[in-house]
Amino acid sequence: MILQNLHCHTTFDDGNNTAEEMVLAAEAAGLRSIGVSLHCPIDGEDWCASSESEPRFIDEMRRLREKYAGRIEVWCGLEYDLRSARRSVPPYDYVIGSCHYLGGFAVDYDQETAEALIASFGGPIAAAEAYYEQMARLAAYGEISIVGHFDLLTKYDERKPLYPTASAAYRDAAFAAMERLHAAGKIFEINTGAISRGYRTTPYPDPALLRHLKSLGGRICICSDAHAADAIVCGFDEAEALAKSCGFDELWQFDGQDFAPVPF
């Protein structure tokens, strides 16, 4: 049973519920610890936290940690994005690194934007190569512990295949980024967020990518990327089954100081 979730969002950014409601949902779902993550401020983007709301988020997470001590452990996380002007992060408990933008386009906004992104690069392979090169840049950020939704660019592929994910060129680009991130000690999340929001029936990353990660000796955690309290553990059974089918027998969980392996 999965007992921790380190990726969820609240009304401090683009979530539907308060931080306290997410903590209570996690407790009700049987989790022993919950990490609430904040989309880092990005100038001009209203789905992220603002520079003014960020300190209030940190204060609220401290309050919730104290209030629910002895019931559920509460961690304060940041989802960092490469588009942020920030080059360092305040003292969060942990940091997730993600890439939501490429070449001026939002990677995951909608299918029309995804298709326009591909067209702007002249085709899906060039777009994928650029995306994974961006992802690989996260390796240089020592504060980042977790790689968020590694193949987010495939969000709409179940509806209409946009990327040739089985091709050698696509996998070479993805594998190269994965290898750089793994070499830097990053943990990869299996992310079920697109399941709860109805875009996919399977988690990120693709099984072929997870099998490659396993061959490298890579580490994983399972997160819901929930934006609503009723999705706090959405898809966890599917994610665990996927991890096991790709050869993983343990998750890496945050203990307040560092990450440690926990067998399934």
Segment roles from a protein language model:
Residues 1-82, 87-89, 93, 154-156, ...:
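An N-terminally biased module of ancient metal coordination in phosphate/nucleic-acid-related enzymes
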Residues 1-10, 19, 104, 160-264:
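Charged catalytic cores and adjacent phosphate/nucleic-acid-binding surfaces used
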Residues 27, 139-140, 214, 244:
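Non-catalytic positions within long, well-ordered alpha-helices that form the structural scaffold/packing
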Residues 34-36, 95, 147, 188, ...:
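Hydrophobic residues within beta-strands of alpha/beta enzymes
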Residues 37, 98, 150, 191, ...:
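Conserved residues at the C-terminal ends of beta-strands
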Residues 40, 101, 153, 194, ...:
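Flexible, active-site-proximal loop/turn residues at the rims of small-molecule/cofactor binding pockets
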Residues 48-183:
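Extended substrate/RNA-proximal surfaces in nucleic-acid metabolism proteins
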